[in-house]
Amino acid sequence: MAESYLLDKLKSVEQTFNELTRRLGDPDTASNPDEYQEIAKSRSSLEEVVNTYEIWKTAQEDLIGAREVYKESASDPELQEMASLEVKELEEKIEHLESRLKVLLLPRDPNDEKNIMLEIRAGTGGDEASIWAGDLMQMYTRYAQTQGWKVSLVSESRGEMGGWKEVILEIKGNDVYSQLKFEAGVHRVQRVPATESGGRVHTSTATVAIMPEVDDVEIHIDPKDIEMTTARSGGAGGQNVNKVETAVDLMHKPTGIRIFCTEERSQLQNKERAMQILRAKLYDIKLGEQQAAVTSMRRSQVGTGSRSEKIRTYNYKDNRATDHRLGQNYSLTPVLDGDLETLIQSCISLDQQERLAELATSAAN
């Protein structure tokens, strides 16, 4: 591997991995379940890097041997040809392993493993924008189902002609944030609305926010900053309807963020859910400030997650979904049916390429 900074990093990771392995075998560690679990998790996060590095080192040794055989077999054309093929195969294998190692060494987003709050807000376009927000909600729900994730409706404000003015979903599962974080931004649709009698194509938008779930340790909220009122809910049917004040209207005074929760069956549950959404929103603001500092130095093609950033256009007439960051078109129907995997992986790959280029540049300076 030509890049010495990567070799140094790999050696450091290997040393850390070996030390963590040693500590796991220490009786003192085994007697402390919390410490043992934390060390085991840290070790597990390095395991793929170390295993790939070991395969790379073995391949390097094999390559040295194959080149030696090639040099010494000048008098045996058949053996030399076999050695030549082995050299080529090993060089390709090493190149692939080095590419993989570079990706594995990229700093991992600490939020990648988290569950999320997915918020969709109708933008420009009136009733059609609300209907479009509903279509996006269905798209993400279907994608989540293909991933085996659990989707729950936590807050909603329905549109007059269907769809939602605003809807918040909670999505739980493995690595949800890592898969969906690049979906944040403005989603534009071009189509003839169901409400359009003249057959004219309209352009409407909806804004998607992807917020990692956080606990009260990560985001502290002063109770004095909260103003809460209750209301009667028309939610869960039966004798509760319009008789018990289960709905919660919560205002965070410093930011002006307002959350109205009616989906749970009790006032306490709705209050807890509203606080959960508020923590996610405040953390999202904090993340946005951090990302703004980074992107002031480097403009990311894959996107900053800004709510004002147009990331995709869905054209019904041409059955085409265009991702503006990737500069690629996709068939619209499968995308709306939740077939987002290729698109999402392309965004992840683009982000990795950008960060690798940045890493190489910083190492050269």
From Swiss-Prot:
Pfam families: PCRF (PF03462), RF-1 (PF00472)
Function summary: Peptide chain release factor 1 directs the termination of translation in response to the peptide chain termination codons UAG and UAA.
Family matches, as InterPro entries: PCRF, Pep_chain_release_fac_I, Pep_chain_release_fac_I_sf, Prokaryotic/Mito_RF, RF-1
Post-translational modification: Methylated by PrmC. Methylation increases the termination efficiency of RF1.
One GO cellular component term: cytoplasm
Region annotation (Disordered) ranges: 21-42
Protein family membership: Belongs to the prokaryotic/mitochondrial release factor family.
Protein name as it appears in the record: Peptide chain release factor 1
Gene Ontology molecular-function annotations: translation release factor activity, codon specific
Zinc keyword on record: no
Organism superkingdom: Bacteria
UniProt keyword annotations, A-Z: Cytoplasm, Methylation, Protein biosynthesis
Localization, UniProt: Cytoplasm
Modification N5-methylglutamine occurs at: Q239
